[in-house]
Amino acid sequence: MRGPLRILAAAAALASAAAWAQSPSASGRDIFLRADKGNCIACHQVPEGAGPAVRANMGPRLDAARLKGWDRARLRALLDDPMRANPDTVMPPYGRHRLLDAGEIERVIDYLHALP
C-alpha cells in the first residue's frame, strides 16, 4: 500500500511543480531571483518552496500574510521608487532607474501575489 501512495504523492508534487513553472508568476519568480535583474532574494526571504532557502534579512520576509492589503498599485509604486514611501530605504528604485521595465515589475507583482 505504501508504494502506490508514494507514487501518488510524487505525481502530485510533479504536477504542482509543472503548474508553477507554467504560471504567470513563474517569470516574476525568475526576475525576483536573478542577480542581473531584480535580485530581490538578496534582501528578502520567501516561504519555503517559493524560492531558495536563504536567510536574507535586510528587507522584510515576503509572504501572503505580510503582503495582505498590498494591491497592485501599491506594490507597483513601491517597486518603481520605494524612496517615495520611505526616504531612508536601501531598496533600489527599480522603475525609476530602469532596472526593471514595466512588464517585469508586473510579473514580480504576479509572483508576490502568488506567495503562500
Task: State each model region's role.
Residues S16-A35, G51:
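Electrostatic cytochrome c docking/interface patches
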Residues F32-L33, A42-D80, P93-R96:
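Gly/Gly-Pro-rich "capping" loops immediately C-terminal to redox-active cysteine motifs
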Residues A73-L78, R84-N86, R96-P116:
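C-terminal capping alpha-helices of c-type cytochrome domains
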